[in-house]
Amino acid sequence: LIRSRLVDTSNCFNLNSLLISTENNKLPNDRSISVLSNMLLFLNYEDRQIDSLIDQIIDWVDYDDQPRSNGYEDYFYTGPINEPRQYTSKRTLYDFSELNNLPASREFDLNDLKKYICVIPYSEKTNINVNTLEFEDALVLASYLGISIDDAEYLIMNNPKDGFKTI
């Protein structure tokens, strides 16, 4: 028996968009960091929690060994207080479950975050398809556009018959 599940990745925030690949490294994508911060603020997380999660994701994926302000590199994950001992991946995320490796993730309801956040392997995609969003996706739209959830709900419910060309 083989089971599969299709997920529409045009209506969620791709965690791999937090970094932009360069020839020698992956650099923070300020726009995507802002979108994820907005989203987590809408979900009532504190700035401290948000900064820790974002920094730890970036450190998990980037190529360098320099920890961000609230992040960790190999020295932490291979140290005596971390079991099992492991190294940062230094690659894009393949699965949402990789967040379980990050200490900051313990302060988040990861099942709840899955409604709004996804991992698209091998992709740094940052865009969403506004025309396929449903009412319950208003938080995603509000996070991307920097608007209120009420305004995002209004846009979704008043989507033109032919869809939005741009917003």
Q: Where does each model-flagged region fall?
A:
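Compositionally biased linear targeting/interaction segments
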Residues: 1-167
